[in-house]
């Protein structure tokens, strides 16, 4: 009888140990973070942080210069800035649109600056392609390079930002004297697109206002 009791107690202890071990394994499986003490846990959020980062206005102006600064654009952008400033400061009826988008308001002026810059670069065979070009067969051979496509898309983004900034900075009032606009627009565009000191003829620094996104 005594022997049977010892066997029974031993069996119960064995079963209890097995149950406890199983429960411990289940806890570790349900909480991998607690079971990762012997290895470095992988942070998927940090790993994916650099994937598909969109270019922001601030990054485009200040830190991503090398990403789009190709000779293809830089060769003509200073010349085109001067030409565009003259074009958008005049009284060309093509740039006076109804609905508050004329060149006497910042939004209309920024549209004029961007469209005129796009046309000027195109005239110099440095055309800005549409970032959503459609079939690959429609893309000219000279811009089939993937790297050039990336540079072009980024350049368009920066240029759109800079035309808005320059329009907001230079067109301080609806009745601003258009004769003084070219002297402001040209340097403002150049300084915004290429802040590097050797990118254009140095001049007094401009304090640009905060970027305003128009709906």
Curated annotation (Swiss-Prot):
It is found in: Symbiosome, Peribacteroid membrane; Symbiosome, Peribacteroid space. InterPro entries: Nodulin. Residues 1-20 form the signal peptide. One of its GO terms (biological process) is nodulation. It comes from the Eukaryota. Disulfide bonds: none annotated. Keywords: Membrane, Nodulation, Signal. GO terms for cellular component: peribacteroid fluid; peribacteroid membrane. Induction: During nodulation in legume roots after Rhizobium infection. Belongs to the nodulin 20 family. This is Nodulin-22. It comes from Glycine max (Soybean).
